[in-house]
Amino acid sequence: MIDKIVFEEDEEYDLTQDSFRYGRVTTGASYNLVTGKIPETVLEQVKAKDDENDDVEFEMDHLEDKEAVQKTKTFDELYESQMPKYFEYQSNFSEVNGIWTLLFDQNHYENMSTFELQAAICAALNSKHYMMICVGIDAFNAVTGVEMSAKDRVVFRMALTRAVAGEFQPPLVKVAPKQLTGVSPMKRDISEVTSSIDVLFIPVIGVTDEVENNRFLIVVRVKEISDKVYQISSGRIYNELEGRVVEMSDMNEAFHKLIVEQSISDIQTRRGSMFMLEPEPFLEDSPVIFTGSKEILRENHEIPNILKENSTERSLSQSLLNLLDIQNIGWIFFGTALSCCIYNNAIKPLVK
């Protein structure tokens, strides 16, 4: 269920600072996830880019990619088997296997920016990891959640949509800016334009001093694995190293680590599957194994004999061809024809 709110009727919300509703940000701007504000000078640049990109076509072909759907199902299976539908306040957050998980406490939420989301998502994509960013877990792995109104949740959704749609190269979402956002309220949630990334607000219950249940664990999910190398539009490239988000120095380092090393690991994996398989349990006195061993040995003896015969035939043919001089082949034909004529005209009548 997507939270809805009409911002035009909200006196507390400053529409001029609603940076989530403007075009693709190509200057690497980062805005606050709570207030949604960026500097006015950057906002003007964003508006200018919005006018330039009005004609960009909206494409969602990746949503029909069967392989991507299969990968999403794999993430869903991992997620649904380990994550509950809600959390008790101060309950322990258990380790999630198979999904790279980043944890932030509720105090960090107030100062959290879209740049942190972009860097973590970039690192997950480049490292070929499923990922979850969980906001609302303290240093003791206790789930506290974050107090969020309906407006706060909408702002966070908008921030994530802008961060994903406008800052990655190659683009994660190919969308015309004003089809995605605009002066009107939000038209599309991130889950509507890409199947690879979404956000959930999981209820945190059991807080006695709160009248309404407005406490949630924020979970941003990267649900698909990509073979591409991504960078943020500011030129920064990120990777996962020992569970942390690490910035790479340049594209050359990214190419070496993310492509060359991956290729080497793939080759090693293939070699392992060919030559390093664990042997099956061996029964020494089993007649079945003994009979099978004889058949295998017989087949192994027959194969070299066939190969020897084939190689002998090839060597004889090759030697005959080597004896023939290709340049004198015409003289051979001429001599053959002359012999036939002499035989037919001179020798054959005498024999009769």
Curated annotation (Swiss-Prot):
Disruption phenotype: Exhibits no defects in piRNA processing. In a slfl-3 mutant background, almost complete loss of mature piRNAs and piRNA precursor accumulation.
Keyword S-adenosyl-L-methionine: no
One GO term of the biological process aspect: primary piRNA processing
The entry's keywords: Membrane, Transmembrane, Transmembrane helix
Topology versus the membrane: Single-pass membrane protein
Region of interest (SLFN-like fold), ranges: 87-235
Subcellular location: Membrane
GO cellular component: endoribonuclease complex; membrane
Signal sequence interval, chain numbering: none
Residues passing through the membrane, by range: 326-343
Principal localisation: membrane
Family according to the record: Belongs to the Schlafen family.
Functional description taken from the UniProt entry: Component of the trimeric PUCH (precursor of 21U RNA 5'-end cleavage holoenzyme) complex, that acts as an endoribonuclease processing the 5'-end of precursor Piwi-interacting RNAs (piRNAs). The PUCH complex consists of tofu-1, tofu-2 and either slfl-3 or slfl-4, where tofu-2 exhibits endoribonuclease activity. PUCH-mediated processing strictly requires a 7-methyl-G cap (m7 G-cap) and an uracil at position three (U3). PUCH also exhibits a strict bias for piRNA precursors with an A or G at position 1.
Assembly and oligomerization: Component of the PUCH (precursor of 21U RNA 5'-end cleavage holoenzyme) complex; consisting of tofu-1, tofu-2 and either slfl-3 or slfl-4.
The protein, known as: Schlafen-like protein 4
